[in-house]
């Protein structure tokens, strides 16, 4: 084999392997997104969270469920108490979300701070916030009820680094969960 021909074969193999790695990386990323969507939708179903996906992108809602429930731990602060009281919980029983107060706020952090209701209000918007308002709160930490003041407990500095697409998925998921009636869980809805 001539040197120029050998060089051509080596170059073709190299380019083919690089393209193959890039394609596999893209496939893996897509599969990763798909698996996060599946995990999010399965979690909601397993916990009895009835999602209203009509008119919404199911994959976006599923990704939002994954981010809210598996990554963000929003239930830990925005539900009081976060899980049902199962006496066998420490013996390996599966945890069960407190569905009656799911994300309706009411968790106390000292004498002056209580977590907010982030379920959809009567207008269908989570916490009564438009997408633009929600994005502003997450990006700046500014309290929507007290402009110029920061949210005291909310870990917004962590969430502000998320992509707009991820935050949109969270917003769409919060729009798709059931609202909780006013004053059911100790925190009035607006």
Predicted regions and their residues:
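N-terminal export/targeting leaders of redox proteins
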Residues: 1-49
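Ligand-binding pocket scaffold of soluble enzyme catalytic domains
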Residues: 14, 29-38, 45-46, 145, ...
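Electron-transfer interface patches adjacent to heme c in soluble/periplasmic c-type cytochromes
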Residues: 28, 93-133, 157-167
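Electrostatic cytochrome c docking/interface patches
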Residues: 38-69
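Sequence/structural segment immediately N-terminal to covalent heme-attachment motifs in c-type
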Residues: 57-82, 88-102
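Extracytoplasmic
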Residues: 69-72, 113-115, 149-151
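Surface-exposed patches in mature extracellular/periplasmic domains of secreted proteins
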Residues: 74-79, 146-151, 181-188
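C-terminal capping alpha-helices of c-type cytochrome domains
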Residues: 128-144, 156-184
